[in-house]
């Protein structure tokens, strides 16, 4: 398996769990997925689509990641924990993009034309985020874990939620910015609401006993 220096460098820069380049080349699943995509993409561009799709199938079978060989991906592409990553045929991804596990860059149309997202440079897409349709995500954008993005996002924005909404743009908070490890959790929010209701009921019962 061949590894591009820029993709390997991205692993070393972005994944603190990797202690050496040798370790990354042997065991880093995301790097392996990117390498297999690069090989398949070259074959796809050369018109050897059957060979490209075979590599894609092998990659999906081994890793759980499905990056169509027709997708266009720039340099220094980093996938952390590749399982569940899906990138469609007409997706375009810029340079220095970070994708976490379970991310989907999908289509919402059955047409043969451009139907998947275009992602700019220096973008971070959090765990389980879904970006759908022929939309454009600008440069320097952060998409929070679990977000569902269905519309264009301008440069220098932070997006969270379902549907995805901009909470920060060009350094100005529109809502409270949330980090990758501090994003909305609907289940946890419901639990906290129930706890508050229980506490209130306890207070009412205590007052009745007096």
Regions found by a protein language model. Give the residues of each.
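Structural signal for interior beta-strand "rungs" in well-ordered beta-sheet cores
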Residues: 60-167
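Terminal amphipathic alpha-helical/low-complexity segments used for targeting or macromolecular assembly
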Residues: 1-63, 174-210
